[in-house]
Amino acid sequence: AIASGGDEQGPDDVVFGVLPLFHIFGLNVVLGVSLFVGSAVLLIERFDPVSGLEAVEKHGVTVVSGPPTMWAAWAGVPGVDPGILSSVRMAISGAAKLPVEVAQAVEAKFGIELDEGYGLTEASPVVTSPRGTGAPSGSIGITVPGVELRIVDAQGEDVLVGDAGEIWLRGPNVFAGYWQDDDATAAVLTDD
């Protein structure tokens, strides 16, 4: 499902569902995967750091996905029991770059290592995952099955390892184009 390396989400999981379902992260990663694999989803109407932590503990949530701002808010709650997230076995950060300081604060406070992948709405959204790879904190891991990824220069040629470039990808999860907007589609998609 959302992870690779044998530690996937499954029917015994309880998923924290606080992300808005109008966003691809909430719709596909949280709700869609949960429905597909049979996980229970604890739907939360509005994020509040304290009541969110209490809900995770009360309902035995095992999978939490959220943006760095959510994780930072949880790490910033004063006087919270460090074991309040002890039921969580998968902790995923997405929707924005995860600052190293936030990852470190969450690990120091709760003993949880955050996994940060890479994705975008146009790729439904997951492209890479560090789960099961041993990738260090700050790495987005490797491509998920079926996705091919290249980093290229301005001419579309592959760059050397360590050089900056633009991410190009393809796979069955990549969209066919923007609805009724051929110009926008042509600006981001190539024939190959």
Residue ranges and their predicted role:
Residues 48, 153-155, 181, 185:
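Acidic/polar helix N-cap motif
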Residues 1-14, 22-63, 77:
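Conserved AMP-binding/adenylation subdomain of ANL enzymes
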Residues 36, 53, 58-66, 72-136, ...:
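Gly/Ser/Thr-rich phosphate-binding loop
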Residues 67-68, 172-173:
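Beta->alpha turn/N-cap motifs
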Residues 150-168, 187-188:
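Conserved beta-loop-beta connector loops within the AMP-binding
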Residues 111, 173-192:
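Conserved ANL (AMP-binding/adenylate-forming) active-site segment centered on the GW(Y/F)…HTG consensus within
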Residues 138-144, 158, 188-192:
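Short Gly/Pro-enriched turn/cap motifs at secondary-structure boundaries
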